[in-house]
Amino acid sequence: MPELPEVETSLRGVEPYLHGKIIKQIVVRTQKLRWAVSDELQHMQGAKIVALSRRAKYLILHTTQGDILIHLGMSGSLGILQENQQPAGKHDHVDLITQDGMVLRYNDPRKFGCWLWTKNAEQHELITRLGPEPLSESFTAAYLFARSRNKTVAVKNFIMNNDIVVGVGNIYACESLFMAELHPELAAQNLTEKQCERLVKVIKEVLAKAIIQGGTTLKDFIQPDGKPGYFAQVLQVYGRKDEACNDCGTIIEAKVIGQRNSYFCPHCQMLPR
């Protein structure tokens, strides 16, 4: 699933081609993704794209006729091409075409993403309920420690909760907990202030590094220029079940926590008794 670094990579990849451009047409080939594609999108001819931004895993196109919320879902990706350069494929569900002939193409084999119109993205219910951005100054050790009090949930599920902090998906949660030397099943309420300092620090480091690497390609995700994300080449625990830990040589284990596969080193990430 594309996570925060993949969406940030997509934003940076498409922004130079779309910022300031006028929408000629939005072609919708599939009316139902995770939710129904907003009808308003097909009536945005002449709208100017005045800015692009990201909130959590949502890419937002701010236009003179409202905002477009895009989510990549489980398997989505965005590509930039010239109009009439390449016929749409089976999984190419939406094309945003600009007056100068650029095409933003949305591909999603599993059809679990979304394209929604809203008057103001900041006031949309999908956005207003979100926690702080992990790379922002508001995501601090003091904040995380305060939110963790009386939380019996596993720390891995805790940091993946978008009400607590956005964009820390499964891959980056596993990697961050490894770097912080925290077992994924440790109860959030048992985190110390020092552990929260370390965890916040490594979450920021892991996500920043992943963005530099263009995200993580495990199956479907590709960057707008067609290249894969290279962070997969430096994963320490995620997807490495039965392989040796790079730090201590202990065999990496996997366990389902919160309905997701979790990867950890039982030696580097010991669960306190």
UniProtKB/Swiss-Prot annotation:
It comes from Actinobacillus pleuropneumoniae serotype 5b (strain L20). The active site is at P2 (schiff-base intermediate with dna), E3 (proton donor), K57 (proton donor), R260 (proton donor). GO terms for molecular function: 8-oxo-7,8-dihydroguanine DNA N-glycosylase activity; class I DNA-(apurinic or apyrimidinic site) endonuclease activity; damaged DNA binding; zinc ion binding. Monomer. A zinc finger (FPG-type) spans 236-270. Pfam families: Fapy_DNA_glyco, H2TH, zf-FPG_IleRS. DNA binds at H91, R110, K151. Signal peptide: none annotated. It comes from the Bacteria. Belongs to the FPG family. Keywords: DNA damage, DNA repair, DNA-binding, Glycosidase, Hydrolase, Lyase, Metal-binding, Multifunctional enzyme, Zinc, Zinc-finger. This is Formamidopyrimidine-DNA glycosylase.
